[in-house]
Swiss-Prot record:
The gene is OPG143. Envelope protein part of the entry-fusion complex responsible for the virus membrane fusion with host cell membrane during virus entry. Also plays a role in cell-cell fusion (syncytium formation). It is found in: Virion membrane. Residues 2-342 are virion surface. InterPro entries: Pox_virus_G9/A16. It comes from the Viruses. It comes from Vaccinia virus (strain Copenhagen) (VACV). This is Virion membrane protein OPG143. The keyword Phosphoprotein applies.
Length: 378
């Protein structure tokens, strides 16, 4: 019978490419069993990513070891941005805890498992593995810099995503109450987050005549028109004498609405195209596009009465506009320019030039000399 396989020699040799890598050369009494097991012992402190979005120190966390061993390999700044997850299975020498045995060539998890008494010297564990995850800022100054976009260089994504998430809502609510015309506040409002719309509804209920309230109304209509209607109602209820509010809160009078229809179709404060839409409730804004009439102004310079009859004539068709739902009240109106045929301008020019040349030719001709003829009648 042959002798049993015994381990005669163990030698640790350093790696070449990476100082963390080492080789454990195992010499047996039978040379065919000799092995060179490659392993690593982590010694770096990571301030960079080993691959996009993750850090994987060469450390095998075996049972009974604290996870603090993993976090000791990354700098404090990264510790705020990365979280530890369950890494891949690994093996480590018990007499060199944390060492990471490389699986390569004949050295596989199955090979180690089948070795007799292997568990006395080799332990199983999980490799330290960190992935990047957005994190919350710990101080108000950092939140202010990120949300106001004063300095976004080191801001986590959740605080630097054009206000798509709720993380800046608390800061922006207070910030924009003090400076509602700030471009960043208007960008926050354009994200159509309800805290932003509610904030501007409260602001415009006191300052509806401000320019930023025009943008507020444009943004919220039609989907969230109630925020604007509430602001207009409160403002006009507190400023009844403001002429801008006469369409939304007209002095009580039954005759106009009774005989002329909805006041949004005839009252100057409603129909004047130069007026801002923010002074109309949303339903008035829609109604104004559906008024079934053509309005005009009649100027009478003289009035002649004959047989108790008066006749007035006014051309109301020259300002005729389309009837019905012309456009959505949430979209700006673009007036079409009057297009004339291209040949018409050339024809008019040719006629004018011909007339000019005709008169020039007539007046440039020399006068015809004639003799005076005396005629006497008997």
């Amino acid at each position: 019978m042959g002798a049993a396989v015994t381990l005669n020699r163990i030698k640790i040799a350093p790696g070449i490419a990476d100082i963390r890598d080492k080789y454990m050369e195992l010499g047996f009494n039978y040379p065919e069993y000799n092995r060179a097991v490659k392993f690593a012992e982590e010694s770096y402190t990571y301030y960079y990513e080993t691959s996009p979005g993750e850090i994987k120190p060469k450390f095998c966390l075996i049972d009974g070891m604290s996870i603090d061993h993993c976090s000791s390999f990354i700098v404090p700044e990264f510790a705020k941005q990365y979280v530890l997850i369950h890494g891949e299975p690994c093996s480590s020498f018990k007499f060199r805890p944390g060492s990471l045995i490389y699986y390569q060539n004949e050295v596989t998890p199955e090979y180690i498992k089948d070795l007799k008494h292997a568990t006395d010297y080799i332990a199983s564990g999980q490799r330290c593995h960190f992935i990047k995850k957005d994190y919350l800022l710990g101080d108000s100054d950092s939140v202010a810099k990120c949300c106001s976009k004063t300095n976004t260089k080191h801001c986590p994504k959740i605080f630097n995503n054009n206000y798509k998430t709720e993380h800046c809502d608390d800061f922006m609510t207070g910030f924009c109450r003090n400076d509602p015309g700030n471009p960043n506040c208007l960008e926050w409002l354009r994200a159509k987050r309800k805290p932003a719309m509610s904030t501007y509804s409260d602001i415009c209920s006191k300052h509806m005549d401000a320019r930023y309230c025009s943008e507020f109304i444009r943004i919220i209509r039609p989907d969230y028109f109630t925020f604007g209607d509430t602001a207009l109602y409160v403002f006009c209820n507190d400023h009844k004498g403001n002429r801008n509010c006469w369409c939304a809160n007209y002095p009580k009078s039954n005759s106009g609405d009774k005989y002329l229809g909805p006041r949004v179709c005839w009252l100057h404060e409603c129909t004047d195209e130069s007026r801002d839409r923010k002074w109309l409730y949303y339903n008035q804004d829609v109604q104004r596009t559906r008024c079934k009439y053509v309005g005009c102004t009649i100027n009478v310079n003289s009035l002649a009465l004959k047989n108790s009859q008066a006749e007035l004539t006014s051309n109301c068709t020259r300002t005729t506009s389309a009837v019905g739902d012309v456009h959505h009240p949430g979209e700006p109106v673009v007036k079409d320019k009057i297009k004339l045929p291209t040949w018409l301008g050339a024809a008019i020019t040719l006629v004018v030039i011909s007339v000019i040349f005709y008169f020039i030719s007539i007046y440039s001709r020399p006068k015809i000399k004639t003799n005076d003829i005396n005629v006497r009648r008997r």
